[in-house]
Amino acid sequence: MCIRDSSSFIFGWAPVVDGDVLPAQPFDPQAPEMSKDIPVMMGTTLHEFTSSTYMPGLRNISKEDAIKMVRQRYGDRADDFLAAFAKAYPDYQPKDLLDTDFIFRPSTLEQGRLKAVQQGAPVYMYMFAWESPVMDGMLRSTHCMEIPFVFNNVVRHASMTGGGAEACALGEKMSSAWLNFARTGNPNAEGLPQWDTFTKENGALMYFDNQCEMKYNHDKELIDIIRTFPTRGF
C-alpha cells in the first residue's frame, strides 16, 4: 500500500496498482475472472461516517440549515438531490441529508453490478439501517455497526448496540443469514423476507432494521446524482 495521490478517496490514501503486490485493479474494468463462480455478499451501513456524531451542531439541525448545506455541496443539482433523497428516504430527518453515506454505497453498488453481469455466481446486497440507542442515539447506523449483529455478539457489545430485545432479535436473524451464506452461498434465513439476488437491473438489497425488508433500486436516482460529484464529505 502506497501513498502517492493525495486526492485518492476521502482519507487521502489508497492501494496503488504496482504490478507486484497488486498486479491489477480488482474491479476495473470488470470483476475478476478467477472468482467468477464464487458467490458474494456485500453491503454498507446507512450512515457510515455519521457526520453528526463528530459535528454536534448537526444533531438537531433545522431542515432549512440542512438544505442550505446541501445547496453548498451540490450547487445547481441541489433540487435534484433533495427530490431524489425524499424519494429514497421519504421519512427522513434533516440530519439524514448530511449523515447518509455516499462514500461506500456508490462503489459497493458498482462492484456488485460488475460481479452480477458476469453471471457466474449470485450477488447478495444489503444495507444496515438499524440505529443504535446508545449515547442518546448519537452513533446511528455508523461504520461497522452491523458487525456485532453478524456474529450475534449483540449483548457482549452492548456498549455499541444497547443490548436490548430489538437488537438481540435482529442479531439472531442476521447471524443466521451470514452462517447460511458461509455454508451454502445463500443467505436466506428464517425470520427474514426472501432475499433475492442482486442484478444490475433490479438493484435488490436486504434492508436490515427492526422491520427487515427487500428494496429494489430504492436509491438509484440519488446515487446517479452522487456519482457526478467527487467523493468527499461535507
Report each predicted region and the residues it spans.
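Substrate-gating cap/lid region and adjacent catalytic-acid/histidine neighborhood
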Residues: 4-166, 177
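Mature extracytoplasmic/periplasmic domains
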Residues: 112, 179, 188-215
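Acidic/polar loop patches that form or flank catalytic/metal-binding clefts of enzymes
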Residues: 121-126, 187-193
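A structural signal for short secondary-structure junctions
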Residues: 142, 172, 198-200
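Non-catalytic, well-ordered alpha-helical segments in soluble enzyme domains
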Residues: 167-190
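Tryptophan-rich aromatic "cage" segments
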Residues: 211-234
